[in-house]
Curated annotation (Swiss-Prot):
Annotated domain remarks: The IMP cyclohydrolase activity resides in the N-terminal region.
Pfam family, one: AICARFT_IMPCHas
Name recorded for this polypeptide: Bifunctional purine biosynthesis protein PurH
Gene of this entry: purH
Cellular component aspect of the GO annotation: cytosol
Domain of life per record: Bacteria
GO biological process: 'de novo' IMP biosynthetic process
Pathway assigned in UniProt: Purine metabolism; IMP biosynthesis via de novo pathway; 5-formamido-1-(5-phospho-D-ribosyl)imidazole-4-carboxamide from 5-amino-1-(5-phospho-D-ribosyl)imidazole-4-carboxamide (10-formyl THF route): step 1/1; Purine metabolism; IMP biosynthesis via de novo pathway; IMP from 5-formamido-1-(5-phospho-D-ribosyl)imidazole-4-carboxamide: step 1/1
């Protein structure tokens, strides 16, 4: 049985008019009768395309400032009518079958994103007739084609040309899925927006913004790839991306070469890229198991890479490397000759670097583009039976935010190193301790249940690589609950400590720093990372 359905009549009503004139003309050229509404009908008529206004077809005018246009039995009967089953009813009531619906919805998200948007503005951009037509057509995909995305116009015309002006059930079903995804996302945005509002009628108010967190959490993601497995080989996995991902992210990066990214590759690349974004100077971040194992600045990225690698060459093996400048030939050569690496990501990659990396065919090379804004949005963590949702940790301090609490003031060089390793500590799993000197990590202690043991591990790692801890700055992602961490740091040769402060025993910790002649800086900001 042939499941193709010819397209003889289409209803077109779009807010986003990208490509709609060309698409409507293509349909008209193939003998399709076009129904349309409002601004879409006027645009098509101005372009010389024959159009029947929906109000002329239904005999019922658009009304209430356009709020009621398509909500009529002659429209929805034409869309929902089952061919071969409802034909007699449709004929009795003068309902013509509508074979294709081309609709996208009022720009609700764009409206509420505008500065100064009021609740009244938002309400007027809630589409009613559009979603109803979309859902009707998608429900009746056995007989009707629904098109909600401009990027599908060319595909539809091509299939009509290849299939005697008809579309297959397979295509109609695929387009119906896209339609339901479209309306689900749209309703989710509206629910999220209204979920942050608490009605406060009176005093000319219709709502007050109460919370950035809605009563229900709706967010839609599109599957970008299926994976061989997840974090472990017995776990199935896929990678989903937001509808409009942030610029310069692992989600939007272009893969130039290499094997498909794994679950762990993506997680680690994200950690490396977000860390390297913190620095204005040429920087390199090497990540292993979601923790920076080497971070450094340099005159150029080759120097930055060389210094970052020296922090912990053992852990750097099989790691992820991120840069905040273009990957050049010299740096690509140094990496490929020195170590095995899973992923390299940079804002751009020179043609010479691409050619050099090509010799390592499995190495994943990503180009993410430049970044001009900070990553925004929410962090979401799954727990059994629920989600933890919070702002992303964008907190960072400048020199003006720092408070020196010790008797000894930090030197200019110590202050510079303190700010450097404070940025690194933000991306190390708690409990996090970072030793640094001269814009280079000297030792990283990550993920220990005891802060003093993280400090000991940072020292051990530095010693293993022959790096001098004497004179280093130490950053701690959270306060020291006891003086033992300071005593251990002093024994290792640390001369300056940067930490949030806020412990009940701050006085004891500061006294320990003074006893050891150390400078101590409070940031007033914690950076737990779990």
């Amino acid at each position: 049985m042939n499941n193709a359905r010819p397209i003889r009549r289409a209803l077109i009503s779009v807010s986003d008019k990208t490509g709609i004139v060309e698409f409507a003309q293509a349909l008209a050229n193939r003998g399709v009768d076009i129904l349309s509404t409002g601004g879409t009908a006027r645009l098509l008529a101005e372009k010389g395309i024959s159009v029947t206004e929906v109000s002329d077809y239904t005999g019922f005018p658009e009304m209430m400032d356009g709020r009621v246009k398509t909500l009529h039995p002659k429209v929805h009967g034409g869309v929902l009518g089952r061919r071969g089953q409802d034909d007699d009813v449709m004929e009795t009531h003068g309902i013509n079958p509508i074979d294709m619906v081309v609709v996208n919805l009022y720009p609700f998200a764009e409206t509420v994103a505008k500065e100064g948007c009021t609740l009244a503005d938002a309400v007027e951009n809630i589409d009613i007739g559009g979603p109803t037509m979309v859902r009707s057509a998608a429900k009746n995909h056995k007989d009707v084609t629904i098109v909600v995305n401009a990027h599908d116009y060319e595909r539809v015309v091509a299939e009509m040309d290849a299939n005697e002006k008809s579309l297959t059930l397979e295509t109609r079903f695929d387009l119906a899925i896209a339609a339901f995804e479209h309306t689900a996302s749209y309703d989710g945005m509206i629910a999220n927006y209204f979920g942050t509002m608490v009605p406060s009628y009176g005093e000319n108010k219709e709502g007050d913004e109460e919370s950035k967190f809605p009563r229900t959490f709706n967010q839609q993601f599109e599957k970008k790839q299926d994976m061989r497995y997840g974090e472990n080989s017995h776990q199935a996995a896929a990678f989903y991306v937001e509808a409009n991902p942030e610029e310069a992210s692992v989600s939007t990066a272009r893969q130039i070469q290499g094997k498909a990214l794994s679950y762990n590759n993506i997680a680690d690349t994200d950690a490396a890229l977000e860390c390297v974004k913190e620095f204005d100077e040429p920087a390199c971040v090497i990540v292993k198991h979601a923790n920076p194992c080497g971070v450094a600045l340099g005159e150029d990225i080759l120097e930055a890479y060389d210094r970052a690698f020296k922090t912990d060459p053992t852990s750097a093996f099989g790691g992820i490397i991120a840069f905040n400048r273009e990957l050049d030939a010299a740096t690509a050569t140094a990496i490929t000759e020195r170590q095995f690496v899973e992923v390299i990501i940079a804002p751009s990659v020179s043609a010479e670097a691409v050619a050099i990396v090509a010799a390592k065919k499995n190495l994943r090379l990503l180009e993410c583009g430049e970044w001009t804004t900070k990553t925004t949005g929410f962090d979401v963590k799954r727990v059994n039976g629920g989600l933890l949702v919070q702002d992303r940790d964008q907190g960072m301090v400048s020199e003006d935010d720092l408070k020196v609490v010790s008797k000894r003031q930090p030197t200019a060089e110590e202050l510079k190193d303190a700010l450097f390793c404070w940025k690194v500590a933000k991306y190390v799993k708690s409990n996090a301790i970072v030793y640094s000197k001269g814009d280079m990590t000297i030792g990283v202690g990550a993920g220990q249940m005891s802060r003093v043991y993280s400090a000991k591990i940072a020292g051990i790692k530095a010693a293993d690589e022959g790096l001098q801890v004497e004179g280093c700055v130490m950053a701690s992602d959270a306060f020291f609950p006891f003086r033992d961490g300071i005593d251990a740091a002093a024994e290792a040769g640390i001369k300056c400590v940067i930490q949030p402060g806020g412990s009940m025993r701050d006085d004891e910790v500061i006294a320990a720093a003074d006893e050891h002649g150390m400078a101590m800086i409070f940031t007033g900001m914690r950076h737990f990372r779990h």
